């Protein structure tokens, strides 16, 4: 008796028992969600050389201990305008702020950077126990920790400071960092000891290469390199993106400024914007917004005409001929529309300008790239999940006609879902999927034809005047 798998709508010629795994497969096969951007920042607080996942203001407050309005987080704010999740990587750590809070007792910021200078330690006598003291830590005048102790050695570290030394907290010491300091002043209910000496450290090229090395093991859709200078560093960045895309099959895009990458994986930002609060977002800083917007865009969404939230002008207003010329060079531009005072993306393109039979001008459009990348990433994910599922049940995908049919069914279901969502068109499983056994008969050779749906960006009207 014959057996195997079957596809709904296709009758078998032979009698037999056939199993259709369609229901289970449909539960697994899905379109992946986009929205994650990897972003290096030179912030003034937080753990350095590690990624922190930020999806909300609450995440930022809890995981980093900073307000979203902190001046050092401009790039994060711009990226988060469109990205769902920002994998924030603090590039460097400067000197840690500190202060003596009693004779022989010191409080030291847990992280280096100028933000540590905004920490204040206040020591008050406990209202219920005259022999105890309330030691309160403040960041930006907001209470972040409070401990009641009798001796300094009882103090424990919190998320903002560590305490070292032993001594009597009622000692008389100078109040460092506060206005009106005197050589000696008794700690009282209004005393505030401000930490000082915290400094930032400017990142260098090696800090950015450390960022790229760390990012290689993370999962993201788009990654930004927000640097103004350094062609060698940008070339390293482009090589990193090419290695991920072409060597490892991880279809991501990279965004940098003023670098003609001539590659569909690199977006070249060459213009900046002016925010409503007067902040100038230069092209290198604008990479954060472009990366966030590109990550947040779905596979069937173009950024062409998308407005830059909070922008009131561009840094350089370009005439028509200049815009056309620079688009031809693969530059990502912003345009100011004087009619409604808005700033928007001129055209959602990447840096690819050399077209071939294998990569025509369609590959210069980021929307098309997002569709093709979705096919690659989603099918890779689904096949891995399928292999894992079969391994978990004590079997493998058979290198046989049955396994071939099962893989084709999974691909068909995914492509149909993608077409229903408007990402592709004209898909025909009979014509567009060809699967055969490889020469060693331990795998499959799969040919897949895909027709991505482009965005309507040009509208032509023939107007007849009667």
Curated annotation (Swiss-Prot):
Pfam families reported in the protein's UniProt record: Gp18_domIII_N, Phage_sheath_1, Phage_sheath_1C, Phage_sheath_domII
Gene3D superfamilies, sorted: 2.60.40.4290, 3.30.1370.220, 3.30.1490.360, 3.30.360.90, 3.40.50.11790
Similarity remark: Belongs to the myoviridae tail sheath protein family.
Protein name: Phage-like element PBSX protein XkdK
Organism: Bacillus subtilis (strain 168)
């Amino acid at each position: 008796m014959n057996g195997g798998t079957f596809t709904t709508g296709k009758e078998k010629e032979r009698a037999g028992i056939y199993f259709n795994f369609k229901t289970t497969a449909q539960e697994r096969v899905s379109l992946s969600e986009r929205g994650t951007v990897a972003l290096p920042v030179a912030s003034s607080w937080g753990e350095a050389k590690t990624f922190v996942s930020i999806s909300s203001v609450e995440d930022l407050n809890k995981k980093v201990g900073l307000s979203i309005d902190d001046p050092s987080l401009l790039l994060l704010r711009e990226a988060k305008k469109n990205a769902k999740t920002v994998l924030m990587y603090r590039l460097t750590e400067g000197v840690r702020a500190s202060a003596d809070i009693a004779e022989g007792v010191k409080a030291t910021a847990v992280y280096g950077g100028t933000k540590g200078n905004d920490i204040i330690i206040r020591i008050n006598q406990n209202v219920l126990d005259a022999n105890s003291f309330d030691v309160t830590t403040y960041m930006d005048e907001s209470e972040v920790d409070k401990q009641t102790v009798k001796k300094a050695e009882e103090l424990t570290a919190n998320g903002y400071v560590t305490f070292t030394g032993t001594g009597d907290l009622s000692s008389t010491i100078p109040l460092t960092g506060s206005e009106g300091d005197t050589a000696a002043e008794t700690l009282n209910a209004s005393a505030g000891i401000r930490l000082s000496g915290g400094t930032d450290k400017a990142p260098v090229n090696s800090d950015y290469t450390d960022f790229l090395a760390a990012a290689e093991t993370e999962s993201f859709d788009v990654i930004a390199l927000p640097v103004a200078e350094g062609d060698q560093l940008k070339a390293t960045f482009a090589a990193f993106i090419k290695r991920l895309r072409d060597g490892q099959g991880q279809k991501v895009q990279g965004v940098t400024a003023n670098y003609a990458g001539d590659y569909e994986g690199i977006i070249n930002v060459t213009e900046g914007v002016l925010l409503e609060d007067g902040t100038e977002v230069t092209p290198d800083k604008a990479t954060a917004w472009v990366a966030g917007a590109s990550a947040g865009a779905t596979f069937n969404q173009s950024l062409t005409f998308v407005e830059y939230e909070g922008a009131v002008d561009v840094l350089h207003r370009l005439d028509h001929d200049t815009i056309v010329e620079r688009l031809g060079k693969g530059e990502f531009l912003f345009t100011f529309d004087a009619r409604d005072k808005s700033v928007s993306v001129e055209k959602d393109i990447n840096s690819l300008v050399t077209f071939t039979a294998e990569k025509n001008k369609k590959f210069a459009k980021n929307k098309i790239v997002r569709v093709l990348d979705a096919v690659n990433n989603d099918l890779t994910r689904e096949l891995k999940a399928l292999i894992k599922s079969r391994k978990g049940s004590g079997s493998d995908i058979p290198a046989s006609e049955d396994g071939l049919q099962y893989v084709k069914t999974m691909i068909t279901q995914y492509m149909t879902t993608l077409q229903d969502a408007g990402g592709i068109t004209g898909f025909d499983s009979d014509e567009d999927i060809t699967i055969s056994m490889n020469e060693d008969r331990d795998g499959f050779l799969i040919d897949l034809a895909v027709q991505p749906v482009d965005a309507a960006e040009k509208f032509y009207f023939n107007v007849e005047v009667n």
